[in-house]
Design a protein with these regions (language model features):
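Membrane-embedded alpha-helical signal segments
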Residues: 1-204
Length: 204
């Protein structure tokens, strides 16, 4: 990761599969008179904590900082978050999928990772209605967003893709097709998507 913010963002977008993963977010802002960006995974972080203790002090930093000073200035400005510097894109991605927010700034080599974790805390418990079924039992009863978060806690990898879709006409139903990019059988995935497209209105 070099000091080119646009190139670093392009690289992270690619590694996170942001084109299809709906919970991989980036927000652009200015700090120390420089363009900057913060990446995070929705559901794995506390957005209130990030806004108040990370973004607010950085967005209000109106001083100038050179390329060599910007990382140190950001560290000093954000006092209430654990922070660590990373320079390898794989390490940066690992920080993101573990619930950290990652800040990049134009002219700054690498990225700064801030611990702003705050996710759905319960484990995936066995569904009571399936107590006699053999095999692993894992039940989901939350919103789609929370269910995606629970899965990301189990499989902390950007290769876990979540494609949001809407099926049905009269009563549209939102759903998320989740799969491991590096393990899925593409033909089976295509057949699944085709069958979902054919679900009739009211048949969900």
């Amino acid at each position: 990761m070099n000091g080119d913010l646009r190139e670093n963002c392009r690289l992270l977008d690619e590694k996170l599969h942001r084109a299809v993963n709906p919970d991989m977010h980036v927000r652009f802002f200015r700090t120390f008179l420089r363009d900057a960006a913060v990446y995070y995974v929705d559901g794995l972080i506390s957005t209130d904590f990030m806004q108040h203790y990370l973004l607010f002090p950085l967005q209000n930093a109106a001083e100038t900082a050179s390329s060599g000073e910007i990382a140190g200035c950001i560290r000093q400005r954000v006092a209430l978050c654990e922070v660590e510097a990373f320079f390898d894109v794989r390490e940066i991605v690992a920080q993101l999928v573990s619930g950290h927010a990652v800040v990049l700034a134009d002219g700054m080599d690498g990225a700064l990772s801030f611990d702003v974790r705050g996710a759905v805390r319960r484990g995936i418990s066995p569904p009571l209605t399936e107590s006699v079924v053999r095999g692993p039992h894992q039940g989901f009863n939350e919103s789609i967003r929370d269910s995606i978060t629970l899965l990301r806690r189990i499989l902390p990898t950007p290769e876990l893709i979540g494609e949001m879709r809407q099926i049905g006409d009269a009563i549209p139903v939102s759903l998320c097709v989740m799969y491991l990019q590096n393990a899925v059988d593409e033909s089976s995935l295509s057949r699944l998507k085709a069958r979902l497209e054919k679900v009739p209105s009211g048949g969900t």
